[in-house]
UniProtKB/Swiss-Prot annotation:
Domain of life: Viruses
Family: Belongs to the phi29likevirus single-strand-binding protein family.
Quaternary state and interactors: Hexamer.
Alphabetically ordered keywords of this record: DNA replication, DNA-binding, Early protein, Viral DNA replication
Name of the molecule in the record: Single-stranded DNA-binding protein
Protein's organism: Bacillus phage GA-1
Biological function: Single-stranded DNA-binding protein required for the elongation during viral DNA replication by strand displacement. Displaced viral DNA strands are transiently coated with the ssDNA-binding protein and therefore protected againt nucleases. The latter is then probably removed by the replisome that performs lagging strand synthesis or during the events that lead up to the recombination process. Has helix-destabilizing activity since it removes secondary structure from the ssDNA in replicative intermediates.
Gene that this polypeptide is encoded by: gene 5
GO BP of this protein: DNA replication; viral DNA genome replication
Region (Oligomerization): 1-26
Domain comment in the entry: The N-terminus is required for oligomerization.
Amino acid sequence: MSNELKQVEQTEEAVVVSETKDYIKVYENGKYRRKAKYQQLNSMSHRELTDEEEINIFNLLNGAEGSAVEMKRAVGSKVTIVDFITVPYTKIDEDTGVEENGVLTYLINENGEAIATSSKAVYFTLNRLLIQCGKHADGTWKRPIVEIISVKQTNGDGMDLKLVGFDKKK
């Protein structure tokens, strides 16, 4: 038996205070926090896909090598968002056991190329674009042209999108 002293961190159990379809308000360690609940979105779900599109989407969502460009490698470039997919996930900190919700966002351009990120800011910007640009399913989608930008955050640089125009050819 060793005579080592170990510092043990005590944390409170998180208590859910309230919940909406978009957020969970929790009380944890003496503070209130709002945790986002991410939705799965797929702009192609309203139409029948070709075999090639289905194969590409499967490989994209399965993480196949070369199926998407990391968004941080595309900073400064402009992208016409023809289609998009968002996939929520939960990760667990192995040291603390704390769960954190996240979301993967895939933007698909007019050439069928995908750009991927786990940036929460991009997810929320995409949702605001859905309000601004309409919906695929009802034919009101105006294809936005966005610039991929790097933004300063408390934990380093993050990704986001800046609306720069609309694609006139649909």
